[in-house]
Amino acid sequence: MNSIVKTLARSIREYKKTSILTPLLVTVEVVMECAIPFVIANLVNQMQAGCSMDVIVRYGTALLVMAVISLIFGGAAGATCANASAGFARNLRKDMFYKIQDYSFENIDKFSVSSLVTRLTTDISNVQMAYMMIIRVAVRCPLMLVFSFAMGFIMGGRLAMIFLFTIPLLLIGLLLVIRAATPLFRRVFRKYDALNDSVQENVQAMRVVKSYVREDYEKKKFAAAAENVQRDFTKAERIMALNGPMMQFCVYAGMVFVMSYGSYTVITSMGLDLNVGQMSSMLTYSFQILMSLMMLSMVFTMIIMSQESAERIVEVLSEESTLTSPANALTEVKDGSVDFDHVSFKYSKKAERNALSDIDLHIKSGEVIGILGGTGSSKSSLIQLIPRLYDVTEGSVKVGGVDVHKYDLETLRNQVAVVLQKNVLFSGTIKDNLRWGNPNATDAEMEEACRLAQADEFIQQFPQKYDTWIEQGGSNVSGGQKQRLCIARALLRKPKILILDDSTSAVDTATDAKIRQAFREKLPGTTRIIIAQRISSVQDADRILVLDNGQINGIGTHEELLATNKIYQEVYTSQTQGGGDFDKQGGEA
């Protein structure tokens, strides 16, 4: 628990002063509130004794001043508390988001995307509420409890002892509730992750859901996930609901005893030396003790709920990236040569088999390499090792003659532009999306990159041209247009190595040929690695690599492979005669 608190406390930073100021302001507020019943008791006794109007005015003025002070300090405490808790939550979100940005793909794979979203939103909101209660309510309630009990003891000692018996009973009950509810809330948050998984998957694949008329199935699937959350949350809340009635019973029982026994002693003068003013103040202090205990109950409830959230947040903040830049990292890539020296790779140490086995491949700077293989042959896995999105399990990968582990990650990835299988565009203008490749790109540079990617032609047809708004995920452009924009974005990086991971699959063959022709003419010194299903997309490459089940099955020119490689021959024949591809090999890349 201490490590969790220390980790979260780092996010307080500039809000440390307001976090400390809030309890101080609350202390003044509580002192005034506890002093008011004492003054009222004296005023009642003075009035019983037949005091003058001057005395009443003097006491009334004192009460008004104390009430105003309490109001001012209470309002100030509320403002500083809101500022500190909101600032703490903002810093925590930033710290988590920045940490996630440093994660490797392996780290991301460890947490599901929906789980990370839940931790960034719901979990942080829970911790924010708990923090707000801790710096204000959790300070106010114990102070109110102690001061009210002390004042009550001063005014009616033996009568105030009643609360010494009720408070331990309440604490025992509270501990039992905490022990029972904590594991249930842990289960609730796991179910929240599953619910978010369902929502995210459905929203992202809405077009597929509708095209297959699967709305009813998705509704049932979501309803089941929501029901699981409801069921476990209800169980947890049933236990937490015992907290309030238990508190009320104990404290109201104490108040009834105070009222009954106190009134009896006032009437019969049984030696408690308790007068009417003191009796009225004792009732006020009893009420303050009641409210303090009730609020403490709420604080503990919130802390119980937020404890699991805090642990989940700390899991993210404590996760160390599996890929980091070394000390004294190289900040310059000499050229675009790539060497795979007997590389083997698997995504998880627990995996039984390698995704890639004994890959020995040497690519010269400026060379064009085509990669073909069936789905499941690990084509994408191979190219992800070049910008060090994953680390090899065995062997080494070199770029510019240097092991990728020796480079600064930002330097390496700036020189290796990858257009991934799944093309992603962000909400914003076409210019905004293109500038992901180069934030300082000029309009002329963007237009040139789009001409090379054969995107300028369709962009010019839009009314707003390069200022056309792209919806989230590029939902308002076609698959082929999206691919060409992503290629243009990569070209703006002016990389030494350009990797196209099946990035023209949605483009017609004529446009694909134009893109390849433009690359030959304008990018002669750039190393190009092209993954494709169509042989026509790679047949002009200097060499073509055929992958099968994560191993090199053949390598050579188009003509050499046609003469010597059985897989290449079969696919070439099927594509020229009937449009076949490598998918018959099975699996997923």
Question: Residue ranges of each PLM-predicted region?
Answer:
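Juxtamembrane helix-loop junctions of ABC transporter transmembrane domains
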Residues: 1, 24-25, 32-45, 66-113, ...
